[in-house]
Amino acid sequence: MAVPLERAFASVTQSFHKDATQGPTTNEYLVARAETQRYAPYAVRKGPAALLAQVGINTIHDSPLSHSHPACYALNAFHFLKVIPRYLHGKAEVWGTKDNWFRKLQAQIDSQTTTLTHRNYAITARDHVRYPGTVVDHPGSCTAGTLFMHDALQYMTPLDVYTLFATSPEMHSLVATAVIPPESVDRLPAFWPELYQLAYYEDHLCYAPDGNFADAYNQPLAAHQWMTMKSLHGPDFTLSVDVPASRYSHHIFVISKRPGLPDTHRDFMCPDLVELPKDFFPGANKADKLLPRTLVNQMVEYAASVKRATIKDATSRTRAYVKDQKYAAVTPVQQMYLSWFGSGLSQMQFPDRPVTPLDNFATALWYRLLPSRLYRLPATIRNFQLKAFVDQLRTPQYLLHFKLDEYHLSSNDKYSDFYRNESRQASSKDMLSAFEAICFGGAPELEKKILGNNNPAPFATVPNPPSQTALGLATITAAIAFILPNRAARLTRLVARYAIRAVKEIVNPSFLTIPRFGLLSHSIASWLQTDGAVITYGLAPKIASWSAPIWYNAALLAPTDMRSCQVLVDIANDLRFDYRYGTMRLAVTLGLTLLNPFLRRLVLLPFKVLWHSYLPSIKNKLDSMVLMSISTLPDNISVPLLTLRGNLNRQRCPDNKDPTPIHESDDNSTADDKCLHCPIHCLKSKLSEPAASPDTVPEDNPLQEGDLTEEVYAAALAKKDTPPPYPTRNDCLLVALADGLLTKRILWFSCIKMFGNTACWVIHDTGKAFDWMHLKMLAEQLKLNVSIEVAAEHDHHWTGLAKRVGPIDGRKIALRWYPYHWELSDRGREDYGPPPPPPPPSTTEPPPPPNPPAASPYHSPTVEDEPLEEIPLANSNGEFSTFAFDDMAADDLNPAQPLSSLDLDEEPSAKQEPLEPAAIKTSEPEPLVPESEEVFFRPSPTPTPSDATPTPAARAPSSVSNENAQRPRHPLPPVPTGGASAPSNDKLNSAAKQYARLVAGKTRQMTVAQPRSKAYLRDLKRGNIGTIPTAEAEQLDAYIDSWAVNGFNRSVHVIYFCGLPGTGKSRRCMKMTERLLKENKYLAQTVRIVTPTDNLRNSVARQLKPPTESSYSVQTYETPIRQPSLGPVLIVDEYGKMPAGWLETVLFLNPRVQMVIFTADPTQGIFRTRIPDAYCCRIPSSTEAIASYAHEYRRVSDRPAPGVARALGLPTTSRRPGQIETSTELNVDWITVRPEGERAAWHNTWGGKVYTYATCQGETFHRAYQMVINGNTRFWDDRDLFAALTRGSGTLRLIYETQSSKPLPRSTSKLYNALLDFRTDPHKLPLAIEEHVNRYIPSHLRNVNQAVPRRNAASNPDALPSQRILPGGQSTTAEPXQSQASALPTGGEAIDVPALDRQDPQRFPQLKVLPHLCGYIGDYSEASYPEPEHPKTQMLDATFPTYLARNRGWNDPALTDAVTANYKAPEHRDIWVEAVGETTRQVHGSGDDRDVFLEHRGDDKATANITYAKRLRFSQRAANERSIAATKVAGSELFEAFTRAIPLPQETFNDSLLEECRTENDTVHLTSKPLATLINNAERSDPSWSLNMIKLFIKGQTVKKLEKMGSDATAGQSIASFRAEVLLAWGPYARYIDRRIRALLPPHVYIHSRRTNEDFEKFVAAHWDHTRESTDGDYTAYDASQDATFVNFETLLMRRLDFPLDIIEAYVEMKASITSHFGPLAIMRFSGEVWTYLFNTLGNIAFTYAKYEVPSVAQVYGGDDKSINSPITVRTGWSQLVGKFNLVEKPVVGYEPTFCGWRIVPGGIVKDPQLLFWRTRYARIRYDAALWAPGYYDELVLSLKTSDRLMDHMSPNDLAYLQALVRFYTKLSRRLPSLADRRRCNPLPADSPSVVLSRD
């Protein structure tokens, strides 16, 4: 029953006026304002305030207080303080409420009659974060009669509420506030976008109060069930659910054991909406057809005013309407429907203006919009729909009208709910049971499971309604037609049968008078619309669609039941709409049916149910068929036959019981009196009407009063003896249960949801905009991942569709299509011409580029002082201060280009002269790049100083480089060629001219630097600054090659606004844009604004007035690279945060850009990357590159408050109150700036407002904020600290966060140290900031226009030295700007710190980054670890001399061609993987030494697919446990064999040893990895990660094996990522076993664990006998073969070592229950376990001794490798055990066995020279020499220890490789300091064979 809002809230609405003519008095106004401030203290905007006033909530628009969501706060507070106190009586408890809110609530109640108890129970983890001091554990039960829960009901399920009542016998009422949008029931868009916005996902929705997604929170999508729930039935009692108060999305629920309101429906507020006619959009979602009435009226007026509107005109008109802010909630799908409606409406016969005949409507609308609908709508239906819609436009406001449901719980199934939108959790078996229930009337198993009926009726005794049986027979016929060859004849007979039946029913007039008749009955139509639609769409789509014309004709000729006819018309329209491809769709359906076992099972389901149902015999099955056949007849025939059949069955029944109860219909009962959900149409139960007692006073039962208000309802709850006004149980079999199990769409989408990895639909372009719009609509409704493939000819203009997130059950469905350019004509006046031509075919070479025009001479800027270019000086080491390239040339920026043979083999002609000091400047070093290329921006040619020598010519490229440059890897994409200088001001584009006019024409010209763009493109390709798809990676290769091929050179005009934080740089730029937008509305089509972050993009889009399309005009910096379609003007905000080289790449890809406008601050943070060898770290940063182009410098800020500005030493014009405070406690309501990124992300996930030092740049906090300073702050750069200090316009609070009494550690940063000393010495902070500003500002002060009048230091005492202008306009000199390399933070380096003490966690900074890790770490002992020495990066350069012979050079073809001659081409070695539709990317394809080895990448989907298919095995936990129990005997055999190898006595468990192992494990876990690695793995410390859940990925590695050189792509290595708690818990026990096994090892057994190669060499020299043969072996799929047998072996080993029993059981449980996102896994070994190498080695020993007779000789083991110094024979009893193991061994017998890559030879161990040779060649190109050279050198020296004995067991080819290696490392040691030190400590032997060989 709908309660009028005026009456419901009359008591709470305050009236401030005495009468209609007089206003309130001053006293009344002040009283009312004070009353309003209690629940609405914050300022509310005009739009939300008007909505709140409609529901009796007054607000204050001029309040000085602000809030992030003031309107929702007022709604929440009004319910909390004004309404809730009415429902709290007697003893009550309050859960989940803040302390201050509880005190406010306590002040509103009567303390004499009500007692409140506060139990701050946290419902979710987010509440624990927001409300400190909450109790995370559930309190268990409520001890009071009434319980109040604040905003928690939406997170609770009916089972949770019922359990709470069951465990709280004293509780009789639950009063709860909840925020549940009522439109979420149908997934409609937000009805009130001024108050909140919604975002729907697969299983939850995101609720953004006041549209602020920064404060948004998630809630389960199933929470909307509380909106339509009337009662909650359980096995013990029944609960009533009422909603006495509701305002927009805020509701008050009362759940009690007392009876509730006698309502059958529940209404909620809704804006004035209308529903578009169904005739236009059959089968569409209702949410997409509900549009605001005013918007539809505008379209109706438009359609009536034009002669004939096309779809293009209607689309343009719709966009013009939707641009209004009040229609912001209208989705693109709704816009599409409105456009179709307008174009079709203009061609229909309107009531007052006929335009065209009615018959033209089908041709004009259906043929044009839906080309595949080849039939016409009947005229009767058109008139009916048009009249209904016109009437609908005159109806009052549309309301959300929900029918209330009764929620049933059953005790035997844990109250599972199958019909309330829980289809995701239902298994396929449950869904098949639902199909059975729909097809054949009832399934006993389904009835037993859902309704809890333990004695269901037999299958044959439940008669089917005619509609259900008829549809079941149609399904069976459809299945036969799909399977059997003669399906055409059967389909013809089926259509004829239904046609004859329909004709008989229609022709016979007696049938038309019956309320329910045959196929056209109301009950059939209702069932078809709800439950039958699933089967109609699913199993027999073609059959049902072919019978649709019959339904049409029947609907037209049956005017007595128009509602039923309309339903049938809708069903037919749905079928025609979805299956519009006819024969093709039939072929696809048939093919999938035959290939897919799941679909085949669904199609054969009728046969299975018919022949394998629950009937005990064939007799009963045939009886069921007879029953269904009878049910298909009309009612006047079927009912007597069913009665006769029941009588016959009664006579045959021996116990005279009626097995088939027939409920005959009552002639006096109507359709409304009968239950349509019941298969037998039983009568509804009558409501019990108790007799009125004469002693009863009418007001004693307030539920019967006419005016039902909140007060009346609250009073009714106090009555405990009120009888329930409705039945408490529903005894009908709900066939509608299956309606919630499957989606409402067609079956193939349902099957994709269930079995998504078996179907992929590729839909191509049909040339119309409708196709992709319809696909986008389906993707939005089903929440599919949409991937778009764009044709090459459309790439230039296409902007892309929004990609939906959230795969279905972890699977992706790809909808690929080529777009139609529907918006090309709406882009404005300026047309950029046709798109570039497509690339040439791959078989032909690309056309040669045209000769680029000569660059015009550069004209100096039109300013007084011309900027001079500073020459980079060389330091004492011969390195440039602005680069970290050492002595590499520009072409060597890419390490993929190898040095030529001349670089390493050529002898210098003379001894190299030492470099002289830089101060003498007698000679200038070789330039880094050729003179034709630019290192960074050069404003003008710089004259060479007279005392400097001329620059030598650049090194000529080698022949290899030329060949690589002339042979592109693939055809080049369309890239710009040629180039030109920037046009003059009079030749600029009109938009660029306008910007130049605003700066008085004083723009500057900037030359695009090619090396910077090359560096950025290579970083982008390697993933150093982000990840990109494979297709884009190939395009980047083409862009990199095009630099050399096309020789692109150009220059652009620039305007650079520079200044300190808060000086209005961005505001000045946006004001210019806003001014020009007002003058020229088409300017937005030619100007693009680029920001570094999404937050800044949204902020800039909101600042511009009128607001622009944020997704089109304002972009992030990735968009111009992915979609290069910029206009003439590019505005870059916060350019300092852009990667180095980004702008040059954008200008290269977007040749139309003529002007670039920057805003940047050199004193704030710059772009950072965690990749230390990234190219962007080696070139000047973005702000350093444009230092000489500053057009305007702004130094006076208007952001910080005077108190904050004085403390920071900054000039300001602000007058806001504020100062710098210090504290140690966080305020959760303040904006927080933290140093840890994962902590900030974690807080933001749960509703906090937290930034990092880097992400806060560009933001302005208009209220107080706090900055956290802890041990991790010292790893940040001064620029980021300065940016974080200057973000706010109010109070700044410094929070010093420590975990112990010890002070925070210091660093070399003066600004950080000044922040630490601020509490004691605040004067150091302004000095540190002044020094920081002086470090970067001076280079920006030359040739700038000062934004303020020049004043000297005396007149401006607040000015910094860097800002003081000397006479003549020159600024004071300062220190040169630091390079980016010297200013990088050290967070990526390995931080070695002392061991952690439990009471002193501050000494371990890693724990501050990983908050959850602290709870897993044990006690530590004090120890000191020296700081590791990081070798200086050294790159290989030019030639250097050697004394060795040169008969075997490094690039001798005899060494290289022998390996590479027989290799396949790179493009033929990668393989195509059909499952993912991609090719592996394991071969580099560069044509150099990198092609020798395969490279596994972590982002290679194809390699991951074949890896998982080969490495993983799947099984359920129960099967794993059974396997463990069945293999105990085989496990004991392994353990017995292991004891023969290593005797293990029974011992007592050593607890002290375990503690040592725990300390060692924890210390190694934190100190062995760099801090950056721990930060990247921070998610492994999340407590929400399940202990038995692993995350799988492939290991990124290079396969450097001799047998894999030049091979085809292979499977990689799968890595399992466990939760950190699992690793830290099991690590000590693994170390314990390792220590005990080492202590018991026999002297002749060697385990290569925690040993070095020198240890292995010593063991071989002491124990190996080279006079006899040895046996070595390897296994195939060794990890996957570690099954349950080895688990039993490992448990026996633990028992022998006296492990605690609970530890052993926990280990077995973990091995049996491991699961992943692919599903539960079988028992196997995973790379990533703490046991992997240990148990692999021990299992190898056990298996070897179980299979072979092994003598007591020298033997070595390591993982799956082994080598035994003797031939071994198979044991006699092995034949009985061979079937119990899955291991496949590959034994090899010989005199020179191999072990772990080493060859055991007389005299020692030797690394294979050929493998070491190619590894060196690969590493020389791929990595820095300092990283790989020392390790390979040690392996070479260890091999050479055998001296001249190598001549005996090495071939001449191996000796040639060895000689080349010795010669190379000898030369390299002269140039690499770290290798030279290693050579002095470990020199090459004097009798090296290289010396012997060099005598020739």
Swiss-Prot record:
- Region of interest (Disordered), residue spans: 828-866, 891-987, 1347-1385
Which residues are connected by disulfide bridges in this protein? none
The residues covered by the (+)RNA virus helicase ATP-binding domain are 1025-1194
Name of the protein described by the UniProt record: RNA replication protein
- PANTHER family per the UniProt record, alphabetical: AT HOOK TRANSCRIPTION FACTOR FAMILY-RELATED, LP07818P1
One biological-process term from Gene Ontology? mRNA modification
The residue stretches assigned to a coiled coil in this entry are none
